[in-house]
Amino acid sequence: MLSTNNLLILLIFSFLITNVKSDLGGPCFSMSTMEGFACGLGVHKNIQIITDCLCYIPGYWEQLDGCDKLVRGPHHTPIDGAEICSRASEYAANPAGFTGETDYYESSTTVMHVVMLDFPTYSPGVTNFLDSSSNDLTTTNTDEINSSITTDEVIPSSSSSYIEIPSETLMESSVSTQPSTIETSETSHATSLEVSSIITGVSSEPLTIVSESGGLNSTEIASTPVVITSPTPQPLLETPSQESSAPNIDSTTPTTIDNTVVDGTTTNDATSVASSTSDVAYVYIGGAMGYPSISVALGLVFIAYLV
């Protein structure tokens, strides 16, 4: 049986496992700015590197501030993200002559992550400034990033965050209206079961339905109502598969595409479609919380040791 002291030690150990991030952790990223993560924030030996590619992403710092507040130095003075981007470009242009501050700090709930500008391989416009083995996400080409985050439409920041596109512009090909029901009367020799199997079996090969008035092939069935008669009144047959497959060409409901608007430039939102731009999901990369199996294993070993 565990003693009081051993139980206290176990509780402290459990608290540390579940609340302290490991060295493998990184800063808090916004899931809606994966373009910025791919081209701008490299991770190498727990040093977070700022590049002008990251600074290019509109609104990145505004969203990052929603998760971790940027602070400078021991007094935790708030920092403007644009200032850091400016300093990064200035430092890269002339590292030897740079006299400004190069060390910045990013506070999180558990640890302090150092953001440093003085990285020997950093230069403006270079996205793959780290070895690919250290962070594969930094190998993304600049042109690919630019093409993925920009559009031909430019919307002022004061206007709506959505672009409305009428649905008819997305449907250039003609759509034929297919009948959804088959009527029956009293003069045919075909049963309702046969009619159902014939309609269900319509394929690319022409099929013929034989009736007193002649034959109808599958193309005519798809474009004109079909009336098939039988000796006795039959219930109305419905073909929901045809009805559901025929789009409503009369619908003019606009289709909305969510585009995050920052400083007059539209960007593709990687996580939300037709949702508010303020709804941003955040996630911590790595850390002890990211490896629960290790924590559980260590806890079991510790308990076994105490027992």
UniProtKB/Swiss-Prot annotation:
GO cellular component: plasma membrane; side of membrane
Keywords noted in UniProt: Cell membrane, Glycoprotein, GPI-anchor, Lipoprotein, Membrane, Signal
Membrane topology, record value: Lipid-anchor; GPI-anchor
Propeptide section residues: 287-307
Covalently attached lipid (GPI-anchor amidated glycine), positions: G286
Residues that carry a glycan: N146, N217
Signal sequence range: 1-22
Compartments in which it is found: Cell membrane
Record flagged with keyword Signal: yes
Region (Disordered): 232-261
Composition bias, Polar residues: 239-254
UniProt induction comment: Up-regulated upon milbemycins A3 oxim derivative (A3Ox) treatment.
Name the UniProt record assigns to this protein: Predicted GPI-anchored protein 44
Species for this entry: Candida albicans (strain SC5314 / ATCC MYA-2876)
Gene designation: PGA44
